[in-house]
Amino acid sequence: MGSTGTQSWLDKLEEQLNVDVDWMAPEWIKAMPFKFHDQTSNQLWVDIQLGDDSNKELFEQTSKELKGQGWLAIYTRMAVLMCKKNIDSIQGRVLLQTLPSKAYDTQATLDHARLYDKEFARAGISRERFCIKIPSTGPALNAAKILSAEGIPTLGTALFSLAQAIACSQAGMLYISPYYNETRAHDELSLWPDVSDPALEHPNSPRVVQILETYKRLYKETGKEQPLVKNASFITPQEAMAAGEMGCHSATISHTVLEKLSKLPYDASKQPGEGLPKPVHAYKNADPLPERLKKLLSIDPLAGPNWDGKLASTDVDYLANGGAEIDKANEADKATKTRLADALTLFIGGEERSKAKVEAMLATV
C-alpha cells in the first residue's frame, strides 16, 4: 500500500474494486507492498516465465516426467506450477488461458480446460483458487457452458462487445474481461485514444458501462448470478481509475501500470470523477452509474457512424448451434472482428514460442 498518511491511487482504486495483477513474475509480486486479489496471465506471460532461468530446473524435470505425452502436457503442467509460485502471495485466484489456436474448436478448448483442472488438483490448488480464461467465440463459449456445469470456473476473454458479454452470461461464467484498449494499441500508440478523462471520453467506456448495466438488469430480472466484470488492457493509471468510476468489480493491471498507481498520491480534487466503495454483493447491492456517465448508455463510438442505436438483445440465444449467433455478431461488428482476430494472433504467437521451447527442451532430456 502507499506510505503511511499518504493514500496512493492504488489504495483508492482498491477501495472501489478488487485490484488484480496481470503478470506472473513471483519476485515482483512478492516485492510489492500490496496483496493483489487475482493473478491473471496469457500465453505471452506464460512464455516469458517458461524462458526464465528461475524455472529452468523445473522445466527440465517436468519435461523428463512427461516425455512422450506431447508438448501440451508439459506446457500445461509448467503453467500451473509457475502459478503455484504465486498462490500464497495473492488473496484470490490464479488464471490461465486455453489454447488460442483452438479458439474455434469446442472439444479442444474443453480438453485443455479439463487438463488445467486436473493439473491444478495435482498441484493442490482447489477450484476456489483458479479460473480458466476462455476466448469469447461461439465454439469456445459452448465449451465454457459445459465447464461451468462441471464446476470449473471460467472467464470470458478477448471480449470487446455487449453481445459477447451476454453470451458469457448464458454460459454461466464467473468473470468476463472486456479489453479496455485493443491489444495492438499497447505497441502502436497511434491506435490508443489518449484522452484526459477516460471514463467519459475513451471510446470503449460506453461498451463497459452498457455491459455492467445489462448485467445489473439481468440479475434483477432473473435472480441469477452474472459474470463479474474484470476490466483489462490498461495503458495508463488514469484508465485503471476509470474502471473504478464505471463500477467494474475488478481490474487486472500490468506490473508497469501498477507501479505507477502505487507512486501517485491521490487527490480527489484533481480527478475528473470518482468511483464508489465496492458493494458487499456486486449485483444485489450494485451502485447506480454515476450521473456524469449516464450519457454513455446511448452511444457507441466503436460502432461507427451507421450505428442504428440498438444494443445487443438479451433475448438472443447466442450459444445455440455451436455459437452461431455470437460468431455472427462478432463478424458484424467491425471493432470486435478486428480486435478479436488481433488478440488471438498475438496470443497464438506466444503459444507457438512456448511450443518451440518445450520441443527444444525435449530434445535435450
Question: What is the predicted function of each stretch?
Answer:
Residues 1-33:
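N-terminal amphipathic alpha-helix/helix-capping segment at the start of soluble metabolic enzymes
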Residues 9-20, 125-131, 143-156, 217-231:
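Short beta-strand/loop segments at the ligand-binding rim of alpha/beta enzyme cores
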Residues 17-23, 37-41, 92-98, 130-134, ...:
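Hydrophobic faces of well-ordered beta-strands that scaffold small-molecule active sites
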Residues 36, 41-140:
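Active-site beta->alpha loop and helix N-cap motifs at the rims of alpha/beta catalytic domains
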Residues 76-87, 110-117, 141-144, 165, ...:
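Generic structural signal for well-ordered alpha-helices
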Residues 94, 98-180, 191-201, 206-209:
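Helix-rich catalytic cores of soluble enzyme domains
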Residues 155, 160-302:
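Catalytic alpha/beta core domains of metabolic enzymes, predominantly
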Residues 296-365:
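C-terminal extensions of enzymes
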